[in-house]
Amino acid sequence: MSTNTEIIKNSDLQSLINDKRRLINEIKDFNKSIKPLEFESYQDYFLIKTFKKGISASGHVDIDSLRNKEYGIYYKKIKRNSTQEVGEPIPRNTSSSSSSTRSNSSADISDTEYSGENTPTTTGAASRRRRTRSRAIQRENSLPASLPSISEANANNDDVTISEINGSELPFPIPISEVENIDIASDITERDGIRRRSSRISERDKRRSQSRLGSEEDEEGDGHDGDEGETKIQDLYESLVPKILESRRRSDWILPPKARYTPEKQMRTKPSFKSIKINELVGNKRIRSILSRFEGGVAGIRKRDWDSTQ
């Protein structure tokens, strides 16, 4: 019985050893069958490693060939639009005609209104264009009837009169006789233009964040309606070099010297210039005789070893 049990144990051990060897061989064969995702060639690998910013549609950029008179640099400056919207302050003109315009307009302010383009305000802020009577009437006629003018508002409110309006509270001083001809809409547009740039930017950011939140909520609602287990994978905008399953090893590719990348190296050579010492030059008699003809020619030069150099 003991011999039978020993034979069974040995057979079990041998079968385990054989299974282990078989699994090892299968793993080795499986590893050999795996083909990694690699680049197509060494040239594509070279393009990625030496990638530079430039103007290109496919991502393969040769910036040296792009440098010409049209594309000297790879970026363009973003300039603000020169056209100004209604209600924005008009920039100050620092020409010499500002003083003359101010003096002439102050004399004839009752008859003809002046334009505030060339007249700086006392507070130092950029002046805004004054409305004439014809402009105010045209603007009031073009607006809908839902926006009442100051004269209609004062007619409804008996407590407030035109004489009680303080001219210092307005954005620019206006005579009392001209207050009736300015409508509320023009004042609103001017006050919108006077607002700080930081407040306008913050309001714009708030509107953008609210729109983004609304779009995200819509996307989440659409996603819950579909299959919950399915995940949406978004591809990248552009693949620089596509990867393929059966690719050639990039280490087997060698570019010709003409296509290899050689970075620009700065020469580490220090230029050497020929120098002549003034004492050795003046030591010559002929040079000394020429310099002695001029005022202060040999003054301040050491007279040592003058006779040694002839």
Curated annotation (Swiss-Prot):
Annotated Polar residues bias? 107-120, 139-155
Low complexity composition bias: residue spans: 92-106
User: Which keywords, in A-to-Z order, does the entry hold?
Assistant: Nucleus, Phosphoprotein
> Where, subcellularly, is it found?
Nucleus
Segment Disordered: which positions?
Answer: 83-155, 192-230
Which biological processes are named by the entry's GO terms?
A: mitotic cell cycle; negative regulation of transcription by RNA polymerase II; positive regulation of DNA-templated DNA replication initiation; regulation of DNA-templated DNA replication initiation; regulation of sporulation; regulation of transcription by RNA polymerase II
* Origin superkingdom: Eukaryota
Which Gene Ontology molecular-function terms are recorded?
A: protein-macromolecule adaptor activity
* Composition bias, Basic residues: 127-136
Q: What else is known?
A: Present with 861 molecules/cell in log phase SD medium.
Per UniProt, subunit arrangement is:
Interacts directly with HST1 and SUM1. Required for the interaction between HST1 and SUM1.
Please state what the protein is called.
Answer: Repression factor of MSEs protein 1
Lineage runs: Eukaryota, Fungi, Dikarya, Ascomycota, Saccharomycotina
